[in-house]
Every structure is written in C-alpha cells, then in structure tokens.
A protein has these predicted regions:
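Short, non-helical or kinked segments that cap or interrupt transmembrane helices
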Residues: 56-61, 78-91, 138-147, 195-200, ...
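Hydrophobic, membrane-embedded alpha-helices of multi-pass small-molecule transporters
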Residues: 30-43, 172-179, 197-198, 236-266, ...
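N-terminal signal-anchor module of multipass membrane proteins
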Residues: 2-81, 89-105
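Juxtamembrane interface elements at the cytosolic ends of transmembrane helices
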Residues: 10-12, 16-17, 44-47, 181-189, ...
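Intrinsically disordered, low-complexity non-transmembrane regions of multi-pass membrane transporters
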Residues: 1-34, 219-238, 272-275, 285, ...
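Interfacial segments of multi-pass membrane proteins
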Residues: 94-101, 187, 310-325, 331-335
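Membrane-embedded alpha-helical modules
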Residues: 106-216, 329-436
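Membrane-embedded helical hairpins/re-entrant loop segments and their flanking transmembrane helices
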Residues: 15-30, 52-73, 251-322, 438-441
Length: 442
C-alpha cells in the first residue's frame, strides 16, 4: 500500500471468525450504515452539549463535525479511524473571551471564532512540524505528568460553569441532581452500547423526567415544543462571521497544545486496538484536525477534536473500518441541515444541560488522573508533586496573566505553566558522592 494513497478496502463481514474489521477493510453497505449510525449517536451528546455551553448553534456544530470528519478522512488517506466532534477544551476560553452568560446564543461569538481559527492555525503548523520530525519532541515536552495535570485542570476550570448553569432556581438545582443520577444509573446498571452512550441516554431519560415534572405536574416551567412544530425539516443552519481580536486570539490559541496532547493519546489508543502503527500518520492527523477547526470556526462552528466516545465504540464492536466514519459524517451532515432537529435540541432544559455538564466536566478531570495511573506517574517525586499542585490550583482558580494588552486565561496559564514547571523541576542534580573518609587506627 502506498503510504500517501488510500488503501484498497477489502470487503469483510462481521460474521467472520475473528469479528475484527481492520481500518483497510470494509463492511457491506447496510452494515456500514448501521455502524455509522452508532458512531453518530456516540458523538451526539458532547457535540451538541459543548456548542450550547458556548452559545453556538448546535445544528451548525453537528454539520461541521461531519464535514471536518470527511476532511480528516481525506487528509489521513482513509487510514486513521476517528470522528471529529466539538472539543470541551474550548468552552472555558470561549466564555472568558466573550463574557457569555450561558443563556441562548452568544452575542459576541465573532471574536471567539477568530480565536478558534487562530488555534486551528497553530494546530496545523504543529502537525506540519510533526510530519517532518516526528512526535518525540512533543512527548518530551508534554510527558504524562504534564498532560494529566492539564486535562484535570481543564475539568476543574469548567466546574463553575456547570454549577452556574445548573442552579438558576431551586427546582433547576434538583433537576440537575436528577440528571446526574440518571446518567450515573445508566453508567452503572447498563451494559454494552447503552453504557457507551451514557451521556445521550441519560439526557433523554432526564428530559422525559423533566417533562413529566413540568408539563404534567406543573412543578416548573413547561417545555415548549412550538418551535419544533413550526421548524422546517430541511434548511441551512445559522452561520456566523469571525472577527479577529488580538486578546481573544491569545486566549484561545493555546488550546492547540491541549488538542495535540489529546489527539496524540487518542491515536496511540487506536494504534493499540488495531495493531497498526499510526506514527506515520500522526502529523497528517494533526493537520486534518487543525484544518477542520479552521473551517468550522470560519462559518460559526466550534473547534473540533478526535472523540474518545467513538474510540470506545470501536473497542466494543471491534470494527475499525475507516469507511464507517464516512457514513457517520454523512449522517451528521444530514442532521445539521435539519432546522427541526436543531429546534428539538433547543428544547433541552437548562437544568438538564447543567446536570450533564457536571458529569462531563467531572469526567474530564478524572481523565487526567487516569493518564497518571495508566502511565504510572510517580507523584512522590517532589518535582511532579509541586508541578501538579500548582497547575491544578491555577486551572481551578482561573488564574490569568496579563502582559500589555494580552491576557492569558486559566487554561492557558495551566497549560504553559505545566510545561515550564516540568522542564524546570524535572532537572536533576548529579549526586556527587561524598569524599571517602579514611579511618586510621589509633
């Protein structure tokens, strides 16, 4: 197979003995479509939730996730099985840059889009460098102790956003708690694909419960489906034009470093599952993700990243065929062109979104700890301990640094602080043995 060409996909059925479908194999059309639906459903929860938290049009974000996934597919030569969805790493910095209050559409989204484009540009440049010299420099710059600390800091930084959106009233607070319980029960007491879709299934159950509590029992503001009934089945989503503000760009662009670390981890996980060496395609994967982020930000969508949810689906199904993600992307694009689907998304109550956010942002924080555990990071070393302690407080407290007219927000200071502190504190002085003492007999 040529390294930079598309593979010759071999037809295979999941009914074969091994049940494993490799990236360069394909299923019959009907099975490919079904698997595509599974992946579209898997990405749905977070890809819808993240733009809502930033005040973006979720319909457009769904559409751009599909287009971005197709772009990623072509740039990687159809060899890397991944789906690109809305990244949670942008939520905190977009809210900080725009002052969004969490309700409705973001009136200042244009300057955030400029920052998202800048982030995608930085990400793309990093990908081009990786294509030339490989990823070892990234792994040295951001070892597991750094990436774990940064990921956990992101989750902690987003915590106030989740709590604020879940506590508009006493009723909303209780419904947020019920949403957390719904998701938790799905996570613990279900199995297989249902368990993998815990956010989506939990959201659906919580919305049904909210509807009973409000529309039937009258305990809160009823869910209004008027917009859904009047919305067209097909139409264009709401596009936005980016504006380039220096401070917003400086605030959002550093997210590229986080996306690199995240994507690197995801691709290593895919390599481990498929038994294929993904290193030759790592740079192109970064470029594909970066260009997809630029394209999404150019029209009003959120920044994107490879999705762990879809990696989880692959782990369950053992189907790694990249053509499945083409099917998932097409399904996402069809949903993105449906205003009725978008109107249905907007009926999700704020309390339910807040409850889901508590779980999602908490899972992000825990993912940082998982990185430490999986890589056996030694937190008994004072260098690691001090770096992690400082970075978690910087991220959780949203510590900002201002230089001239530019401000680096909490996620940015946590990211660069982790890299710099690790480089400084991981240095070891060479132990010089003490001079030998000669004891003379008296």
């Amino acid at each position: 197979m040529a390294m930079f060409g598309f593979p010759h996909w071999q037809l295979k059925s999941t009914s074969t003995e091994s049940g494993v479908v490799a990236p360069d194999e394909q299923l019959p059309f009907a099975q490919t479509a079904v698997m595509g639906v599974q992946h579209a459903v898997a990405m749905f929860g977070a890809t819808v939730l993240m733009p809502i938290l930033m005040g973006l049009d979720p319909n457009l974000s769904i559409l751009m996730s599909g287009i971005g996934t197709l772009l990623f597919f072509f740039i990687t030569g159809g060899r890397v099985p991944s789906y690109l969805g809305s990244s949670a790493a942008f939520v905190g910095v977009v809210i900080a840059a725009t002052g969004f209050n969490g309700q409705g559409m973001n009136p200042n989204i244009s300057i955030a889009l400029g920052g998202i484009i800048a982030c995608g540009l930085v990400y793309t440049v990093i990908g081009l460098v990786v294509m030339k010299i490989g990823t070892r420099w990234i792994e040295r710059l951001m070892p597991p102790v750094v990436t774990g600390a940064v990921v956990m800091a992101i989750g902690l930084n987003l915590a106030p956003i989740a709590v604020k959106s879940a506590s508009a009233s006493a009723f909303d607070s209780w419904m947020a708690v019920m949403t957390v319980l719904c998701i938790g029960l799905v996570a613990v007491f279900t199995r297989g694909m249902i368990q993998r879709l815990l956010i989506l299934v939990g959201l659906i159950v919580a919305c049904l419960l909210y509807g009973v509590m409000t529309n039937v029992l009258g305990l809160g503001k009823a869910v209004d489906f008027t917009l859904v009934s009047h919305a067209a089945w097909f139409g264009l989503p709401h596009f936005s034009t980016p504006a380039f503000n220096g401070q917003a760009m400086m605030l959002i662009a550093p997210v590229a470093v986080i996306l690199v670390a995240e994507n690197l981890g995801h691709l290593k996980a895919v390599a481990g599952m498929t038994g294929r060496n993904m290193d030759p395609y790592m740079g192109r994967a970064f470029v594909g993700d970066g260009l997809a982020t630029i394209l999404s930000g150019s029209v009003g969508g959120s920044g994107v990243t490879t999705y762990a949810e879809n990696i989880g689906v692959m782990a369950v199904t053992k189907v790694y065929a990249t053509l499945v993600f083409v099917a998932a992307a097409v399904i996402a694009m069809l949903l993105g062109f449906s205003p009725k689907f978008g109107a249905l998304i907007h009926t999700i109550p704020a309390a339910v979104i807040g409850g889901a956010s508590i779980v999602v942002f908490g899972l992000i924080a825990v993912a940082g700890a998982r990185i430490w555990v999986q890589n056996r990071v030694d937190l008994s070393q004072n260098g690691n301990l001090i770096m992690v302690a400082v970075i978690l407080v910087l991220g959780a407290g949203d510590f900002a640094l201002t230089l001239g007219g530019f401000t680096l927000g909490g996620i940015g200071t946590a990211t660069f602080g982790a890299i710099l502190l690790n480089a400084l504190l991981s240095r070891r002085l060479v132990d010089v043995p003490p001079p030998e003492v000669v004891h003379q007999e008296p």
